[in-house]
Each structure stands twice: as C-alpha cells, then as structure tokens.
Amino acid sequence: MSKETFQRNKPHINIGTIGHVDHGKTTLTAAITRALSAEGLANFCDYSSIDNTPEEKARGITINASHVEYETPNRHYAHVDCPGHADYVKNMITGAAQMDGAILVVSATDGAMPQTKEHILLARQVGVPYIVVFLNKIDMISQEDAELVDLVEMELSELLEEKGYKGCPIIRGSALKALEGDASYVEKIRELMQAVDDNIPTPEREIDKPFLMPIEDVFSISGRGTVVTGRIERGVVKVGDKVQIVGLRDTRESIVTGVEMFRKELPEGQAGENVGLLLRGIGKNDVERGMVICQPNSVKSHTQFKGAVYILQKEEGGRHKPFFTGYRPQFFFRTTDVTGIVNLPEGTEMVMPGDNVEIDVQLISPVALEEGMRFAIREGGRTIGAGTISKIIA
C-alpha cells in the first residue's frame, strides 16, 4: 500500500486541548474527529486510541502525547492531547508540540480548577498566542442551575483576561453527547471548530521573519575566506546581504558573499535549509559554534532572563536531590551551552525534581536570546530540565 502524499492545499495550524484533569479533554478530541469525519474531513479516533498515547522525546524529556490530525473546510489541523498533567507541563515548556492556539476545556459543573489556572499561566509563559474555551458537560446542568453557568463563564473570562487573553470565545457543549452522536451537541462541536477557525489566526510563516541562523560549524577555505554552517531557523539570506554575528563576544557585521548547499552555490537560503555561508572580512577565529548570524539589529545578546522551567524527576533521568539559589548548571540554547547562576523566586526555598517553577538566570557569557525561546538545562552531560524564556531582563 503506497503512502498518501500530504496535500498542502490548506493552511496548517497546530493546536492542543488543555485544562484540568477529567474535564473532558480527550473526549472532546475524539468528538471533534467524529463530527468532522461525518463531512469526510477526519478519520474518527475513539477515546481509547487517543488515550493510549505514544511517547515522544523533546530535549531529552519523555512526554506522553497523542497527535491527531483533521481538517475543517478551511484548514488542516494537527492536534495534541496529553494524558497526564505533568505531560502537559513538559509538552508546553519544551515546545514538543508548539501550539498556535489552544482549546481550554472546562467542566461547567466544576468551573475553573487548579490545573485550569496552571495551564492558562503556562500557556501565557510559553507564548501560546490564542485560546478558545469549550465549556463541557453542559448536559449535566439542570434548568435551575443554568445561571451558575453564566457565573462560571464570567469567572473564566476574568481569569483569562488577567493572564492577557482578552475576549476569548466560549462555546457551551457536551463532548460525551457529541461523541455518542446527539445531533444538537455535534452541532456545538462544529460551532467550536468555527470559533477555532475564526479566532486562531494562521501564524506568520518562518520564511517571512527576519533571517536567523545558529552557527554549528566554522571552516576556512583557502583563497575564499571563512564559511559558517548551520540550519536556517527563519527568514531568507541572499548573496550580498548584510548580516550581524551575535552572541558570546561583541556583535560584528559582515556581508554574505556566497550561499552553498550540498557543495552547490545558491542565490539564497531559506528557513529549514542546511547551508554554508561565506562571510567577507571574517577570520576563522572571529566566529564560533553557538553564535548566531542574523539580519542586522533583529536579535541582541543578553545575559539575564526569567524562565518557566520544568525540572525532571529522578525516574525521568533527572536529579535525585533538590537545588537552591546559586545552583550553576549549563543552559543549552540552539547550538551552545553556557553556565548560568540560578536565583529562585522569593518564598521558594528550593526546587525539587518534578517541579515547575519560574527562575531568574544570570549567564556568564552573552547569548542571542529572545522571549518565548526554548532551552534545556544540563548538568554533567545529562538533561535535568527544560524551559522557555518568559522575560528578558538584561
């Protein structure tokens, strides 16, 4: 049987379900595939096939996450659903599945619960830009309790707005009833997907952003100069472009005099491609792995930031003991690792394996950093945690 080719005829969006345990995230994921399969836009995935999730690895951390794909008339979606709370935390922090938006599932009978709040905060810290709310289990609410649902909606809107998510649409429904095929509730799933289509914009393609390439290696070609190689993270680079070399030392400027891929010369290199760039006036000792080459003034190097981090448990190959303020592990960004000194937030004595916490980090060398960027924390050659930069300080 031949493999189907991926048809790139609709914009592609990555989304995920988030929310408190047992509020119906996986049931909703199954209900979406059921509702859309009726229109030939998805293959129906039942609850057990989603719940029986494969493991994936991101930055050395094992995450249980299930990926389902489906389409609406306008778009193609990849949807991630995780079974355990810790898996959500790890998935969001490591960016194993980068989300362009999320569906927050809240049970109408419970309202916002601790993990609801934690997932909203995490979504904000790791840069999930948009949220659509599905108020689930509405079939369990009696007529006389109907106004309680209005209160739950108000509380949710306030909670979301507090974290910077203003005006999120809230769709009421029942994932279980929709999964069972109840027509009026299936309609609510269609309404939800319409809200997702309308309220989660198609992200800017990486190719339209300012050029950036982390340097992986440096070569000297006699008579031609210095070549740096790496995978272009975003944007486009052309022969003749002015570029900056940022990180580890003072920022320098240069001009790209050649772009090569697989030993062939190209007029330009684009996001996702592995290329070699020939740089004018730069010696082999002026550049090193871990610096980045970028469009001038698009990125700066920094030494201090706040990060939302998840620290691995012992069973996940992490530390066996807690750490305290003053801890000095390696922080791994793109192609470089730099020692950093950790400061814990006020009122936090120590961080235990398995915790997720916001820390303040002072790096011993400057690195090209941006908010929303992912990093790994390593000690003695093994990953002990992962994080996302939530704020740059200096």
Curated annotation (Swiss-Prot):
Region spans: G3: 81-84
G4: annotated segments: 136-139
UniProt domain tr-type G: residue ranges: 10-204
InterPro entries, alphabetized: EF-Tu_GTP-bd, EF-Tu_GTPase, EFTu-like_2, EFTU_2, G_TR_CS, P-loop_NTPase, Small_GTP-bd, T_Tr_GTP-bd_dom
Binding, GTP: 19-26, 81-85, 136-139
EC number: 3.6.5.3
Catalysed reaction, written as an equation: GTP + H2O = GDP + phosphate + H(+)
PROSITE patterns named in the record: G_TR_1, G_TR_2
Keyword Glycoprotein carried by entry: no
Gene3D superfamilies named in the record: P-loop containing nucleotide triphosphate hydrolases, Translation factors
Signal peptide: none
Binding annotation for Mg(2+): T26
G5, as annotated region: 174-176
Family, per entry: Belongs to the TRAFAC class translation factor GTPase superfamily. Classic translation factor GTPase family. EF-Tu/EF-1A subfamily.
Family annotation (PANTHER family): ELONGATION FACTOR TU, MITOCHONDRIAL (PTHR43721:SF22), ELONGATION FACTOR TU-RELATED (PTHR43721)
Subunit and interaction comment: Monomer.
Protein name as catalogued: Elongation factor Tu
Naturally occurring in which organism (per UniProt): Chlamydia felis (strain Fe/C-56) (Chlamydophila felis)
